[in-house]
Amino acid sequence: MPASVLPLVEAAAHWPARGALVGLDLGTKTIGVAVSDPDRRLATGVETIRRKTFTADAARLLAIAGERRAEGFILGLPINMDGSEGPRAQSTRAFARNLARLTDFAIGLWDERLSTAAVERELIGLDMSRARRAKVIDEHAAIFILQGALDRLATQRRTSGPG
């Protein structure tokens, strides 16, 4: 059965309580990939995929998910500052729908507003060269997106209590 593409908290209801999640920062040329630990406390960068075709990109993402025994995907949704969705958000939703056809994992969408800008500031603060930043920014943005989503899910669990 194809997966569902849902807002983060709704997607989480479809995931088991434990198991890694794969976070994605979709760009036009690359996809930053991060994976959580099985307890969903910490996001770690995995790689930056140079985009080729959807089929090739999806195959690599599904391979990573399999290698890491992941239970779901979280995609950063680039919402505009006014809350509207522009072409990049529509492209992300289309990618998520296409990926959902290839997996049973629920796919969660997480507001990634300002994630790349925040990561860029952090890397500049580390005195990283522009060339080095360009190589790692997408993977670091995926970490930022996934960690934000993990923190939100942890808060949700604490405030809603057991069951």
UniProtKB/Swiss-Prot annotation:
Pfam families: RuvX. This is Putative pre-16S rRNA nuclease. It is found in: Cytoplasm. Its EC number is 3.1.-.-. Its main location: cytoplasm. GO terms for molecular function: nuclease activity. Keywords: Cytoplasm, Hydrolase, Nuclease, Ribosome biogenesis.
